[in-house]
């Protein structure tokens, strides 16, 4: 989608939809929001809706960073402690590696 062909109101509406969609456990939408609207929020000449778009982009970045930290923490803990959890670790695993760590 070429954002240059879209009105400023429509840009704001689309940015807001991606921001709200990220709360449905879809942090990828926040990443898309950051990439699509960063230039509009911070590099484009000033216009009325720009401050709101800037807020949505900042909050999307914070939300995405939060999700990355949470997921990285969970993956690290799971990889380290899965064998110690016994049956629960096996139950949570999609594939069970052979052997012992």
UniProtKB/Swiss-Prot annotation:
Q: Which GO terms describe its molecular function?
A: endopeptidase activator activity; enzyme binding
In this entry, the parts of the chain located on the Cytoplasmic side of the membrane are: 1-17, 37-57
What residue ranges enter the membrane without crossing to the other side?
A: 18-36
Give any single GO term for biological process. amyloid precursor protein catabolic process
Its cellular-component GO annotations read: endoplasmic reticulum; endoplasmic reticulum membrane; gamma-secretase complex; Golgi apparatus; Golgi cisterna membrane; Golgi membrane; membrane; plasma membrane
Keyword match Iron: no
Q: Which domain of life is it from?
A: Eukaryota
Please state where this protein is localized.
Answer: Endoplasmic reticulum membrane; Golgi apparatus, Golgi stack membrane; Cell membrane; Membrane
What keywords sit in the KW lines? Cell membrane, Endoplasmic reticulum, Golgi apparatus, Membrane, Notch signaling pathway, Transmembrane, Transmembrane helix
Specify where it is mainly localized. Answer: endoplasmic reticulum
The UniProt entry lists membrane topology as: Multi-pass membrane protein
Question: Which residue ranges are assigned to the Lumenal compartment in the record's topology?
Answer: 79-101
The membrane-spanning stretches of this chain are 58-78
Record-linked Pfam families? PEN-2
Q: Provide the function of this protein.
A: Essential subunit of the gamma-secretase complex, an endoprotease complex that catalyzes the intramembrane cleavage of integral membrane proteins such as Notch receptors and APP (amyloid-beta precursor protein). The gamma-secretase complex plays a role in Notch and Wnt signaling cascades and regulation of downstream processes via its role in processing key regulatory proteins, and by regulating cytosolic CTNNB1 levels. PSENEN modulates both endoproteolysis of presenilin and gamma-secretase activity.
Hey, which family's this protein in?
Answer: Belongs to the PEN-2 family.
Q: How does it assemble?
A: The functional gamma-secretase complex is composed of at least four polypeptides: a presenilin homodimer (PSEN1 or PSEN2), nicastrin (NCSTN), APH1 (APH1A or APH1B) and PSENEN.
Supply the name of the protein: Gamma-secretase subunit PEN-2
The organism named in the record is: Mus musculus (Mouse)
